[in-house]
Amino acid sequence: MNTRATHKTEGFVLKTLSYSDSDLIVTFYTRNFGKLTAIARGARKSRKRFVNVLEPFCCSSLLFSRKQRDQLAWLESCQVINEFPEIRKSLDRTLLASYLIDLVDHFSIEEKPGRELFELLRSFLLLIEEGDTSERLLRFFEIRHLKLTGYAPALDCCMICKAPLNPQQRYVFNIAQGGLHCRSCYTTPAAPDVLPISVGTIKTLLLGREIETEKMKRILFSGQTARESKSLLSLFIGHILGKELKSLKVLDEIQRMGL
């Protein structure tokens, strides 16, 4: 006879979906189980259960049960650890946090443990909560997220000749191949999926990929680096997913409007 096993972990709400008149299906990214989907019984109607704990990017202590690993979990209880109130007061912070959550949701696989990714998301949401909405924060999250999910762009050397990064050389980034070509190797005409990129931008991304989070603000992020890194990472992520995330479209539009 199968009995339900009960588990406890911490998790961020990635998204919710109405399941019935009273229930919700909630997708979390958890510390111990990675991406986890559970049914929250009565969450749509009850004024006592799950009140204000199933909002996007809210971090909570979760208690869930299920009979088998491949079955949908039942959310037994959910207690808030951090609802990030300052993020919710600000449109730009909310949109930025929503994009980070969207990235994690689209790249993560159901119940593939990823404690490092959980900690990455937690640390960057805390930075946004404290008021950091910089281009640097966004790009460094993207490059670290790609590394942890196995999609890190090859930025250490030319993919063709394997020569290490050279300050005297010029480079392009091939979106489809996911890496650098030095100008000595890349001689074909310009193409929409091949982007010129400066050595300064490459070095900044490599440093941002590895540096301790609390030291990120020390890294200079020039206008050129901001433009080049945004084009490279946005197009590369879109290539991997086969689409541009709606959350990024909204974020870009609001930033262009200066709201």
UniProtKB/Swiss-Prot annotation:
Keyword DNA repair belongs to the record: yes
Family indicated by similarity: Belongs to the RecO family.
Function statement: Involved in DNA repair and RecF pathway recombination.
Gene that specifies this protein: recO
Organism lineage: Bacteria, Pseudomonadati, Thermodesulfobacteriota, Syntrophia, Syntrophales
Entry GO terms, CC: bacterial nucleoid
Pfam families recorded: RecO_C, RecO_N
Domain of life the protein comes from: Bacteria
One annotated GO biological process: double-strand break repair
Name of the protein described by the UniProt record: DNA repair protein RecO
Keyword vocabulary terms for this entry: DNA damage, DNA recombination, DNA repair
